[in-house]
Amino acid sequence: MSGKTIWDPLRRKDVPLTPEERVRQWFIGVMHSDMHVPMHMMMSEVGFKFGDGPVQKDFRADIVVYDRKPAPAMIVECKRPDVELDGQVMEQALRYNAVLDVRHIAVTNGLKTFFVTKGEDGVFRAADKIPDYEEIISQETRK
């Protein structure tokens, strides 16, 4: 590590500048400027436990977007640009969703970004467009 840092506006501190962190900070900017997600409705590096009893494991979601309750509404999984966004990456986000129970998931490596939305039947499908914040927090489900 070179010792370089980047400002994380969500954690309000400098963090080590890694390739994944660069993608995370870029996507925070995209969500704020293009998707109109208020900064105070996002958190980065959100820790949670998954599993029952003594087999619980600690996990961290890269970014979680919250609705106005505040309850989780979207998970974002960020990868380095050289990581292919394959089924394993989406499976990781879906595992996180087993705990956080969101309607929207995004995965990005800074070069490609995929969004999926949960339909009325509970199945996640590719989103036909990038949702803005009001769509993300909407309680209405779509097929």
Protein language model regions, located:
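A short, conserved, highly charged catalytic patch centered on acidic carboxylates
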Residues: M1-H104, L111-K143
